[in-house]
């Protein structure tokens, strides 16, 4: 087979052959195989060229994908599949990228966890789930998580939540709110409970009463649209009790309110 035409098309070159076959190759392919018009290729040379062209093209795609941020092996492989790179070529590209240290799942997991320690608010369970979703194996994640102390981060998150809700909730409800939020963010129950120890939940009676008055007004506006009489009183009691207010305080308020 003879090359009848070589034409540059943006980042690739169009190669046309005298058997009406054509293919796109990278500049690296042109250089490696010393391709030029009228060059004759046998079948083995053509197959080698096609393999190298896709390998070169796929690797360039992968490097472009990696230029934005670190990626896992799986993320790179999935990206190449979307661009219709063949599976055996993808395997070769991943191997090359690993050898050249462009991708490293262990380093990616370590960086992700360290960044969370500095700027994030996620506990180990959520972090592991997110890393698994990136295609990183548990054996690359677990050792890093086990060596990471999440106690200071849990305290930082609990302090932020405390500052946000302390003027809106009574002590019991505030503790429950913070604990549940930490659990949702992936911290263990023990770590969530321990993080509460550095917070001051003391509120004087007047502060609690003011919060109760405010919450009672809010719930009354909401529930009085649907209920009245004894049913309204029951609904108000239940709503306030769920918010963490003392039963005797609620009953006292309701007697004077309704």
UniProtKB/Swiss-Prot annotation:
The keyword Transcription does not apply. GO terms for cellular component: cytoplasm. One of its GO terms (biological process) is regulation of DNA repair. Pfam families: RecX_HTH1, RecX_HTH2, RecX_HTH3. Belongs to the RecX family. HAMAP family: RecX (MF_01114). NCBIfam families: PRK14135.1 (NF010733). This is Regulatory protein RecX.
């Amino acid at each position: 087979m003879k090359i009848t035409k070589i034409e540059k098309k943006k980042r690739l070159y169009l190669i046309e052959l005298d058997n009406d076959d054509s293919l796109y190759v990278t500049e690296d392919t042109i250089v490696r195989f010393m391709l030029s018009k009228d060059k004759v290729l046998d079948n083995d040379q053509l197959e080698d060229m096609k393999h190298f062209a896709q390998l070169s093209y796929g690797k360039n795609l992968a490097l472009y994908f990696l230029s934005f941020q670190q990626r896992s092996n799986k993320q790179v492989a999935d990206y190449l599949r979307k661009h219709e790179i063949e599976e055996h070529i993808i395997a070769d590209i991943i191997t090359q990228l690993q050898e050249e240290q462009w991708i490293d799942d262990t380093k990616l997991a370590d960086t992700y966890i360290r960044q969370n320690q500095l700027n994030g608010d996620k506990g180990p369970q959520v972090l592991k789930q997110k890393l698994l979703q990136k295609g990183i194996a548990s054996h690359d994640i677990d050792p890093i998580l086990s060596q990471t102390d999440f106690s200071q981060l849990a305290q930082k998150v609990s302090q932020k939540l405390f500052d946000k809700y302390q003027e809106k909730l009574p002590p019991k409800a505030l503790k429950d709110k913070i604990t549940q939020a930490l659990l949702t963010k992936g911290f263990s129950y023990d770590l969530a409970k321990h993080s509460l120890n550095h917070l001051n939940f003391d509120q004087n009676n007047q502060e609690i009463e003011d919060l109760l008055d405010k919450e009672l007004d809010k719930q009354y506006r909401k529930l009085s649209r649907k209920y009245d009489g004894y049913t309204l009183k029951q609904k108000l009691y239940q709503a306030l009790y769920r918010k963490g207010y003392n039963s005797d305080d609620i009953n006292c308020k309701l007697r004077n309110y309704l």
